[in-house]
């Protein structure tokens, strides 16, 4: 579907990407409406992830996430459902001032070993706006009907 710079959309932007390894693959979108850009494994040799274990999978890329946004690294649904592989921290957060390599901590939630190959799509990157409000200490909060009810308090 093409690289980040080829997209058309409401919030069209470009992201500077630096290849840290010659064989790294730039992120791509799987369809014209995809929210997440696929991130690819950049490996010198296949990596086997044993059941219940986590492996750090490099992408061979670093990026300039625009100020006022963050990059969120999510699981790819097919990889999670078919092979039980998903980011260990569920959602990785890439801050706009981070300039290091994008690495996916991929966890094997299944009962069988899984092998990741170079060029395999291992996660997806979603760019989203970020708000950084000031936190103000107060003596009391405004009352609401829900109040402090949580964990199922609004219904079954």
Regions flagged by a language model, labelled:
Residues 2-156:
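DUTPase catalytic domain/fold
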